[in-house]
Amino acid sequence: MPTTFKEIPRERPVTPLLDRADTPHGLRRLGEAELETLADELRLELLYSVGQTGGHFGAGLGVIELTIALHYVFDTPDDRLVWDVGHQAYPHKILTGRRARMSTLRQKDGVAAFPRRSESEYDTFGVGHSSTSISAALGMAIASRLQGSERKSIAVIGDGALTAGMAFEALNHAPEVAANMLVILNDNDMSISRNVGGLSNYLAKILSSRTYSSMREGSKKVLSRLPGAWEIARRTEEYAKGMLVPGTLFEELGWNYIGPIDGHDLPTLIATLRNMRDLKGPQFLHVVTKKGKGFAPAEVDPIGYHAITKLEPLNAPAAPKKISAPKYSAVFGQWICDMAEADSRLVGITPAMKEGSDLVAFSERFPERYFDVAIAEQHAVTLAAGMACEGSKPVVAIYSTFLQRGYDQLVHDVAVQNLDVLFAIDRAGLVGEDGPTHAGSFDLSYLRCIPGMVVMTPSDENELRKLLNTGYLHTGPAAVRYPRGTGPDALIETGLDPVEIGKGVVRRQGQGVAILVFGVQLADALVVAEKLDATVIDMRFVKPLDEALVSEAAANHELLVTLEENAVMGGAGAAVSEFLARANILKSVLHLGLPDTYVEHAKPAQMLAECGLDAQGIEAAINERLALIG
């Protein structure tokens, strides 16, 4: 069984077996008796590596043995291995030729936080969002069959990701096309109890063996000729298996279900995977693991050790203590508690983001009004719509990138019916080290085109609270988008009063250039404005746009500059240009925002600089345009 470590090593560990097995080809040259020692070395290497860089932590520790077994048994990369979400893929990266580059994890031009097809041939499908693996692996299995290939397709999905409807859509489809594929459920939520002990592991070996499979198929052919006999035999088999395994649902869908087995028992994993490798049709293996396995603190607190920051050197001077500004999510968390206290109609909904969206306090103070729907964004939005129909006031706390998954519901179920639902959209704009799959680059574009939707962009913590008030008290759908991280430490007013919808605020009066700011770039815009003597307008609303303020700015300035941390295409700046065109106002307009590309992972400041959205980039772009217009 795995060794349990108590500390993260600060020096690179000695790993003689891992040194020989940093690719699957090297791994497969090891003897089976060496693999448990290799697992200890890989776990220690992961502890050291993530300790140096920070990153996702607990999930990878929990799949050390499974990762080794998969690459040992299957002929990767020819056999297609698809990881769901990707939080657990660091051991996979270490074993597939990227060990030497793990020191660059989540850094600019370094190893990505999630599997990327462009990074390695072993990363067969790019991920970041959950519940896509079964559909992707099924598509690969079908395409391989059409091409006459015998390669295997394997999807590894967690119990959390399996709660999403998309996963069940794929589970329902695969048996219809008799796909030759394997789905592995990495169940790290349930404990390893008696039914995952020796008897269950023994049963798994039997049920997955060629002998059992051929006997089962042979018996089916024979018994099918006898009226009623095969049905009796089938029910007897299901009853016997049902006493030991919880696979009835998957069997009913048409999958050959095996398990649950201990995901930290390498011999059992290897034997079971070998047996299942050549079985035809859709196969389902239920593996039970422990998140954070092998690192004592993470086993005790898997949520706290989901991800960690890098270790500071032992001899580093202590950082001076300072009172930091609250995170935008914390401002939201305080606001929803305050508004819930004032209005008993308020209900809070989140798709498995209680901690990230800062809903812990709300869930504890108002448990009967808090709803975590798991990874089910579509359901979250329509659930809110149903609640709104009955007079509740739903607040959907959701990351920008994940709201994309509930877009049809946002339009069809909320907006068309003009229902009172407030979307508190966290992680808007660039999010840093998690990269393009988690960036909130498109919400202004896909929200402002929806009739009746009020779309707001607070410029600091106090504005966030004001605009949350405004959206909540508005009749109809509304959205407030705010970024990851902290703001400029603005003084936060404690009231619950709204602002006038569709009205911006002039923050600095200047001449020549007017910078129309949609969001938290206000601070940088003010810095630039001091140098250029420019006017700065905090627009607040993308929709409805303050057309009177835009008209006034156009009449009194030579150049209008729109500034947003959203895709330029279809974003807030586009709304300004569309209005000017409708009003037949001819004016030079410079749109500053995210380019028509995916911005790769780096520190947020690096990403903003790359896009020209820091103070230096904003100033340079304005001066360049001024030079062109003379």
Curated annotation (Swiss-Prot):
Q: Which GO terms describe its biological process?
A: 1-deoxy-D-xylulose 5-phosphate biosynthetic process; isopentenyl diphosphate biosynthetic process, methylerythritol 4-phosphate pathway; terpenoid biosynthetic process; thiamine biosynthetic process
From the UniProt record, list the reaction(s) this protein catalyses: D-glyceraldehyde 3-phosphate + pyruvate + H(+) = 1-deoxy-D-xylulose 5-phosphate + CO2
The record, for Gene3D superfamilies, names: 3.40.50.920, 3.40.50.970
| Binding positions (thiamine diphosphate) | H87, G128, H129, S130, G160, A161, N188, F295, E377
Alphabetic keyword roster: Isoprene biosynthesis, Magnesium, Metal-binding, Thiamine biosynthesis, Thiamine pyrophosphate, Transferase
Keyword Transmembrane recorded: no
Q: Which domain of life is it from?
A: Bacteria
Pathway terms, separated by semicolons: Metabolic intermediate biosynthesis; 1-deoxy-D-xylulose 5-phosphate biosynthesis; 1-deoxy-D-xylulose 5-phosphate from D-glyceraldehyde 3-phosphate and pyruvate: step 1/1
The Gene Ontology terms for molecular function here are: 1-deoxy-D-xylulose-5-phosphate synthase activity; magnesium ion binding; thiamine pyrophosphate binding
Q: How is the cofactor bound?
A: Binds 1 Mg(2+) ion per subunit. Binds 1 thiamine pyrophosphate per subunit.
Top-rank EC class of the record's enzyme: transferase
> SUPFAM superfamilies under this entry?
Thiamin diphosphate-binding fold (THDP-binding), TK C-terminal domain-like
Please give the Pfam families that the UniProt record associates with this protein: DXP_synthase_N (PF13292), Transket_pyr (PF02779), Transketolase_C (PF02780)
Kindly list the GO CC terms recorded for this protein: cytosol
Report the CDD domains cross-referenced here.
Answer: TPP_DXS, TPP_PYR_DXS_TK_like
Cofactor(s) of this protein: Mg(2+); thiamine diphosphate
Q: What is its EC number?
A: 2.2.1.7
Entry similarity comment? Belongs to the transketolase family. DXPS subfamily.
- Which HAMAP family does the annotation name? DXP_synth
How does this protein assemble?
Homodimer.
Protein name stated in the entry: 1-deoxy-D-xylulose-5-phosphate synthase
Organism the protein comes from: Pseudomonas savastanoi pv. phaseolicola (strain 1448A / Race 6) (Pseudomonas syringae pv. phaseolicola (strain 1448A / Race 6))
